[in-house]
């Protein structure tokens, strides 16, 4: 059994998608989302709980945790499941500085289907 599941994000709604929004002058902005091509359910019973982004610069032995976003609104209220009308979309933007290109890895957690992973290359100009 694999700890992290992976797949083509265009065919699987659980895979975190990494988009580099900006990578210039050492300033990096990265958007991570789940359900870009196929929307992931966001209900009290089935939702993405969090996304985490790590970065491993070229030549570095270990990756660095850039950040983590937790999603707490999944429709629950004092009136019961799926009654609040408030739902968080599993999308986060991370901003950081980097001196080298490297590998970006995002993790996401679905409360029903477990841990998922997506990867991308960060190329600095």
Swiss-Prot record:
<feature type="binding site">
    <location>
        <position position="46"/>
    </location>
    <ligand>
        <name>Fe cation</name>
    </ligand>
</feature>
<keyword id="KW-0479">Metal-binding</keyword>
<dbReference type="InterPro" id="IPR051233">
    <property type="entry name" value="Desulfoferrodoxin_SOR"/>
</dbReference>
<dbReference type="GO" id="GO:0050605">
    <property type="term" value="F:superoxide reductase activity"/>
</dbReference>
<dbReference type="GO" id="GO:0005506">
    <property type="term" value="F:iron ion binding"/>
</dbReference>
<dbReference type="Pfam" id="PF01880">
    <property type="entry name" value="Desulfoferrodox"/>
</dbReference>
<comment type="function">
    <text>Uses electrons from reduced NADP, by way of rubredoxin and an oxidoreductase, to catalyze the reduction of superoxide to hydrogen peroxide.</text>
</comment>
<dbReference type="InterPro" id="IPR002742">
    <property type="entry name" value="Desulfoferrodoxin_Fe-bd_dom"/>
</dbReference>
<keyword id="KW-0813">Transport</keyword>
<keyword id="KW-0560">Oxidoreductase</keyword>
<dbReference type="InterPro" id="IPR036073">
    <property type="entry name" value="Desulfoferrodoxin_Fe-bd_dom_sf"/>
</dbReference>
<protein>
    <recommendedName>
        <fullName>Putative superoxide reductase</fullName>
        <ecNumber>1.15.1.2</ecNumber>
    </recommendedName>
</protein>
<feature type="binding site">
    <location>
        <position position="113"/>
    </location>
    <ligand>
        <name>Fe cation</name>
    </ligand>
</feature>
<feature type="binding site">
    <location>
        <position position="14"/>
    </location>
    <ligand>
        <name>Fe cation</name>
    </ligand>
</feature>
<feature type="binding site">
    <location>
        <position position="12"/>
    </location>
    <ligand>
        <name>Fe cation</name>
    </ligand>
</feature>
<keyword id="KW-0408">Iron</keyword>
<keyword id="KW-0249">Electron transport</keyword>
<feature type="binding site">
    <location>
        <position position="40"/>
    </location>
    <ligand>
        <name>Fe cation</name>
    </ligand>
</feature>
<comment type="similarity">
    <text>Belongs to the desulfoferrodoxin family.</text>
</comment>
<feature type="binding site">
    <location>
        <position position="110"/>
    </location>
    <ligand>
        <name>Fe cation</name>
    </ligand>
</feature>
């Amino acid at each position: 059994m694999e700890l992290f599941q992976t797949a083509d994000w265009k065919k699987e709604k659980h895979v975190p998608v990494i988009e580099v929004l900006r990578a210039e002058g050492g300033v990096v902005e990265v958007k991570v989302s789940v359900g870009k091509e196929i929307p992931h359910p966001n209900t009290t019973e089935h939702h993405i709980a969090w996304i985490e982004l790590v970065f491993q610069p070229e030549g570095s032995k270990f990756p660095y945790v850039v950040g983590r976003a937790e999603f707490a609104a999944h429709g629950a209220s004092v009136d019961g499941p799926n009654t609040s009308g408030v739902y968080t979309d599993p999308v986060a933007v991370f901003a950081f500085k980097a001196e080298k290109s490297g590998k970006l890895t995002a993790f996401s957690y679905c409360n029903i289907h477990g841990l998922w992973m997506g990867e991308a290359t960060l190329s600095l100009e």
